[in-house]
Regions:
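Central antiparallel beta-sheet cores of small beta-barrel/beta-sandwich binding domains
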Residues: 1-123
């Protein structure tokens, strides 16, 4: 999910998660800086918490960069009633932020952008 090309163009992308019964999110993702528009994989395992919402909470998250190897961190998901907010944290710093909505009961669609940016990636 890394910003590979730079050049001032803002990174943004999409993740489509399958919601697995054991509290995991299994996602496929791509973004505006992924070479050859490849689809990559991400897995998020939910940490134990007292959230009433089955999606909201903190997750251990890992993905593999096309040219950089594995990346691990924390994914924070917060319920906003009509949608969810997402924050990917790597090495103690926010890497990406996003918003998502449920698609039925077992899927979650999320758009995300570079965590240093302010606001949504829409001009």
């Amino acid at each position: 999910m890394k910003n590979k090309k730079g050049g001032g163009a803002q990174l943004w992308g999409m993740v489509l998660y399958d919601i697995i019964g054991d509290g995991c999110l299994n996602g496929v993702w791509t973004n505006t800086h992924t070479e050859s528009k490849k689809i990559m994989n991400e897995i998020a395992r939910k940490k134990k918490n007292d959230e009433k919402d089955p999606i909201a909470g903190e997750y251990y998250v890992s993905w593999i960069e096309e040219k950089g190897g594995p990346v691990s961190g924390t994914l924070k998901v917060e319920s906003k009633i009509t949608h969810y907010s997402f924050e990917w944290i790597v090495s103690g710093k926010t890497s990406f932020k996003g918003v998502g909505i449920l698609l039925g009961e077992k899927r979650l669609a999320v758009t995300y952008w570079d965590g240093e940016s302010i606001g949504l990636p829409v001009g």
